[in-house]
Regions:
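Surface-exposed amphipathic alpha-helices with a cationic face
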Residues: 13-17, 77-81, 120-124, 148-154
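Residues that line or immediately flank small-molecule/substrate-binding pockets and catalytic motifs
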Residues: 1, 66, 141
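Conserved anion-binding
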Residues: 31-136
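General beta-strand structural signal in soluble alpha/beta enzymes
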Residues: 23-27, 61-64, 89, 139, ...
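Structural alpha-beta junctions
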Residues: 19-20, 124-126, 130, 156-160
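A C-terminal functional module that forms or caps the active site or interfaces directly
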Residues: 141-167
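N-terminal active-site wall of soluble small-molecule enzyme domains
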Residues: 1-55, 146
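Short, well-ordered alpha-helical microsegments
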Residues: 9, 70-73, 144-148
C-alpha cells in the first residue's frame, strides 16, 4: 500500500502507544551486516537525519529472519540492549510448507533446531532480571511436538506463537 500504508501503520502505532500496548511489528527483517544495522536502527533504534535524532518506528519489538546468521542478527541484538527493545527470530513457522526447509536435517538435527541453538546463544547477552532475554522465537502453534523440543533448547526465550485460526 506504499506511503498510504506507511501512514496508516504509523497512526496505528501511535494509537497503540497512547493505550500503553506492547507493539510487535511483524516485518521479518534482515540482510547482510551493514544493511541489517540500518534496518535495526530504523525499527528499533534512532537515526540522525540532518542533525536531528528521531525514532522512525517507535515499536517495542520486531520479527527477524535469522537465516543470514550472526552478522545479520547482531545489529538487532545490540539495539535491543541499547534501546530496551526485543526481537522474535523465525525458528519453526506455522505455515504448511515450513518443513520444506526448516525440517531438513543437518547431521542428526533439524534446521529449526540449529536455528534455535543460535537464538539461544544470541539471547544469552540480553537476559535480564526476569530470567528471560530480548531474543525470542517464532514457534508455530501448528507444530506442538517441535515446540516442546524448542522450549528445551531455548529455555530463556519468549515464544511468539502464531497459528491459531486461518493460515
Amino acid at each position: 500500500y506504499g506511503l498510504c500504508g506507511e501512514e496508516v501503520m504509523h497512526r496505528t502505532i501511535s494509537y497503540a502507544k497512547e493505550k500503553g500496548l506492547y507493539i510487535i511489528l511483524d516485518v521479518k527483517r534482515n540482510d547482510i551486516g551493514s544493511t541489517a544495522e540500518a534496518y535495526s536502527k530504523a525499527y528499533l533504534g534512532k537515526v540522525d537525519i540532518d542533525g536531528v535524532e528521531c525514532e522512525p518506528c517507535p515499536v517495542d519489538c520486531v520479527t527477524v529472519n535469522p537465516y543470514l546468521g550472526t552478522d545479520g542478527i547482531q545489529p538487532f541484538v545490540n539495539d535491543c540492549k541499547t534501546f530496551d527493545k526485543a526481537i522474535f527470530a523465525l525458528v519453526k513457522t506455522s505455515n504448511p510448507s515450513s518443513g520444506e526447509l526448516q525440517d531438513l536435517l543437518v547431521g542428526d538435527e533439524h534446521i529449526y533446531e540449529k536455528v534455535a541453538q543460535c537464538v539461544n546463544k544470541w539471547n544469552e547477552e540480553t537476559i535480564g532480571k526476569s530470567g528471560y532475554g530480548a531474543v525470542g522465537a517464532v514457534v508455530g502453534a501448528t507444530y506442538p511436538e517441535q515446540a516442546k523440543v524448542l522450549r528445551k533448547i531455548m529455555p530463556k526465550s519468549y515464544f511468539l506463537v502464531p497459528g491459531y485460526g486461518a493460515q
